């Protein structure tokens, strides 16, 4: 009798829990299923936590250079040291270069002249790279380089020495041992858009445009909205787009077309929005950055608006990311934030406007002072001078490579 009573009680208890529906799941035969309420947070606790993170980050922060002009680009020195470290014990042999050739375009500096493979997968990207290499060849010793112009890095660190290498790539995660170099887009070959049909480039010119635009729209005149405009290269961006549709007074975020666009499904079941210039991003206080296929070329531009940058995910890196510090220069968000997480963090900064402006100003200052064209040139120079010391063989000419420069009248 006792056993039967226990069974009945257990059955009543199971039925009373509501099963799958109360767990936030909908069964196949249900006509409708109420969405579960978003997680509630204690606003005071959340605010206290964010303030503590900001205070600690700024207390721990040390400027990357004691020289205000940072004339030797020392701010980025740790990155190239770390990237070259795997080859310090082995050096770089001719066999390593030959086995890595399939991962990129072969460049050769020989006799103070620059040569490369006849076939460049992305000519505009090679143009952007060569813009920085050509002025350096007169001062550099002979060397061979494998430069990857694809979006994605090539050498998985899990492969160890079997991965081959070295290979130079513009972006990577910790799972790769590629050597980062300043992307071609600092000069040419960036993503082609309606506003930039020949591709995003000329960082020198864009810096000046954005500096003027930021000065013309002071913080007090910016719209207190989160803003994003870009294509759907990753579904990580979806929750911000959906939040914008649900709460347009908080966020203005829409998808644009990219080269693979076929229908509104590619823009999350909505018409594709028009592109917005980087200069017009400066109208908004809160700007969002996401990775694309790899690191986003957008990030460096956003800082120059003197707007608060929200950087989603920290996996993908470019050479200059290392000295951009979370809560000092930007607001870090984990990958795939929920709509509620966006709401909470935006609400905090709307209520703490002075804090938002301080972080925005520090982000602007860092990019303006430490990502100048002379910093790009300096990084290339230091990177190649350190790299060539690793070579363990005599570099020889190769007839199959084509001559790039310098031009005859420059010799």
Swiss-Prot record:
SMART domains: CAP10 (SM00672). Changing residue 125 to A: Loss of enzyme activity. Changing residue 267 to I: Nearly complete loss of enzyme activity. Its main location: endoplasmic reticulum. GO terms for biological process: cell fate commitment; muscle tissue development; negative regulation of Notch signaling pathway; Notch signaling pathway; positive regulation of Notch signaling pathway; protein O-linked glycosylation; protein O-linked glycosylation via serine; rhabdomere development. Disruption phenotype: Flies exhibit a temperature-dependent loss of Notch signaling, resulting in bristle loss. Defects in muscle development. One of its GO terms (molecular function) is EGF-domain serine xylosyltransferase activity. It is an enzyme of class 2 (transferase). Changing residue 259 to A: Loss of enzyme activity. InterPro entries: CAP10 (IPR006598), O-Glucosyltr/Glycosyltrsf_90 (IPR051091). The active site is at residue 151. It comes from the Eukaryota. One of its GO terms (cellular component) is endoplasmic reticulum lumen. UDP-alpha-D-glucose binds at residues 229-233, 237, 276-278, 294-298. Changing residue 231 to A: Loss of enzyme activity. Residues 192-197 are annotated as: Interaction with the consensus sequence C-X-S-X-[PA]-C in peptide substrates. The record marks 122, 232, 259 as: Interaction with the consensus sequence C-X-S-X-[PA]-C in peptide substrates. Changing residue 124 to F: Slightly decreased enzyme activity. Protein O-glucosyltransferase. Catalyzes the reaction that attaches glucose through an O-glycosidic linkage to a conserved serine residue found in the consensus sequence C-X-S-X-[PA]-C in epidermal growth factor-like repeats. Regulates Notch signaling by glucosylating Notch in the ER, glucosylation is required for the correct folding and cleavage of Notch. This is O-glucosyltransferase rumi. It comes from Drosophila melanogaster.
